[in-house]
Amino acid sequence: MAITVQETAKIVADFQQAPNDTGSPEVQVALLSARITYLTEHFKSHAKDHHSRRGLLKLVSQRRKLLDYLKRKNADRYRTLIERLGLRK
């Protein structure tokens, strides 16, 4: 996988809501965004890697579902998260 353990730990520490929080929507979306960013860079040099492109589409879909969930449950946390990650909307 592209994201190292140290990068994962840093992302979790930046977005966790409480100590030992690794499952909140914010953490999950941040980790997915990091993987999506890596794969996007990968496709700049490997344009014909269709197998990985399918994985990218699954990651984007999963992130969208988590963002929709967060928007439904707590709109303020949703807005804060998309600002921190620099996502559209």
Swiss-Prot record:
InterPro entries the record matches: Ribosomal_uS15, Ribosomal_uS15_bac-type, uS15_NS1_RNA-bd_sf
SS bond list: none
Gene3D superfamilies: 6.10.250.3130, S15/NS1, RNA-binding (1.10.287.10)
PROSITE patterns: RIBOSOMAL_S15
Matching Pfam families: Ribosomal_S15
GO MF annotation list: rRNA binding; structural constituent of ribosome
UniProt KW keywords: Ribonucleoprotein, Ribosomal protein, RNA-binding, rRNA-binding
Signal peptide: none
A single GO BP: translation
Any coiled-coil regions, as ranges: none
GO CC terms of this entry: cytosolic small ribosomal subunit
Role played: One of the primary rRNA binding proteins, it binds directly to 16S rRNA where it helps nucleate assembly of the platform of the 30S subunit by binding and bridging several RNA helices of the 16S rRNA. Forms an intersubunit bridge (bridge B4) with the 23S rRNA of the 50S subunit in the ribosome.
Database matches in NCBIfam families: S15_bact
PANTHER family assigned to the protein according to its UniProt record, in alphabetical order: RIBOSOMAL PROTEIN S15, BACTERIAL AND ORGANELLAR (PTHR23321), SMALL RIBOSOMAL SUBUNIT PROTEIN US15M (PTHR23321:SF26)
Subunit structure, as described in the record: Part of the 30S ribosomal subunit. Forms a bridge to the 50S subunit in the 70S ribosome, contacting the 23S rRNA.
Family: Belongs to the universal ribosomal protein uS15 family.
Record-given protein name: Small ribosomal subunit protein uS15
Lineage: Bacteria, Pseudomonadati, Pseudomonadota, Betaproteobacteria, Nitrosomonadales
Gene name per UniProt: rpsO
